[in-house]
Amino acid sequence: MAIEVKICGLSTAETLEAALAAGADLVGFVHFPKSPRHVPLEAAPALSRAVAGRAAKVLLLVDPDDATLAAAVAAFQPDIIQLHGKESPERVAAIRARTGRPVMKALPVSGPADLAVVPAYAAVADRLLFDAKPAPDDTLPGGNGRVFDWTLLAGLDPGRPVMLSGGLDAGNVSQALSVVRLDGVDVSSGVETAPGLKSPEKILAFVRAVKAAEAASRPSRLKKVEAP
């Protein structure tokens, strides 16, 4: 199965088109005012329409209340809701039931102890996204360009599709894919020139790096040799 590529934090028509043209499988829109990648509700419909079925639309929210959730879902019309805050398993289940949308729960990781919550979230979320745990001085729950020890995920099988995030870019994504089995990779700061400013060139380079790594990892096909 092909590894899915998600470009997150898109906020302009130009960079959205760059992600779609590059072949991204999922495009992420952040609705969180504290983020430099924040997309306000009034800008959401145009971006959502521009996707036009070429990729899955992911709406990233951080600890949304019911009013924020309803307004954002109405504006973005997402295919998947990504929860990137401290939402409990019970809240994840409630959001999934309330919206009727698949939910991807982001889980922050810095050490083995952080994986103890995986079974509880795997029971209620449709997908799991493992991201680097923010440092104490980080103001955002994700998109900080931090990398964690990918080997922590080796052998992990939560019974749900798994995506990796946290400091990925075109230069290190192949290494990540060689360390742990993944269903997808998620990039934001790794395709930016500054916080919130996506680079079409970096987006293309990242997608190409994933595809190249995927192709290189496929078992070689042995040619049949006829006996003399």
UniProtKB/Swiss-Prot annotation:
InterPro entries: Aldolase_TIM (IPR013785), PRAI_dom (IPR001240), RibuloseP-bd_barrel (IPR011060), TrpF_fam (IPR044643). Belongs to the TrpF family. Its EC number is 5.3.1.24. It comes from Azorhizobium caulinodans (strain ATCC 43989 / DSM 5975 / JCM 20966 / LMG 6465 / NBRC 14845 / NCIMB 13405 / ORS 571). One of its GO terms (biological process) is L-tryptophan biosynthetic process. GO terms for molecular function: phosphoribosylanthranilate isomerase activity. Pathway: Amino-acid biosynthesis; L-tryptophan biosynthesis; L-tryptophan from chorismate: step 3/5. The keyword Isomerase applies. It catalyses: N-(5-phospho-beta-D-ribosyl)anthranilate = 1-(2-carboxyphenylamino)-1-deoxy-D-ribulose 5-phosphate. The keyword Amino-acid biosynthesis applies. Keywords: Amino-acid biosynthesis, Aromatic amino acid biosynthesis, Isomerase, Tryptophan biosynthesis. The lineage of its organism: Bacteria, Pseudomonadati, Pseudomonadota, Alphaproteobacteria, Hyphomicrobiales. Pfam families: PRAI. This is N-(5'-phosphoribosyl)anthranilate isomerase.
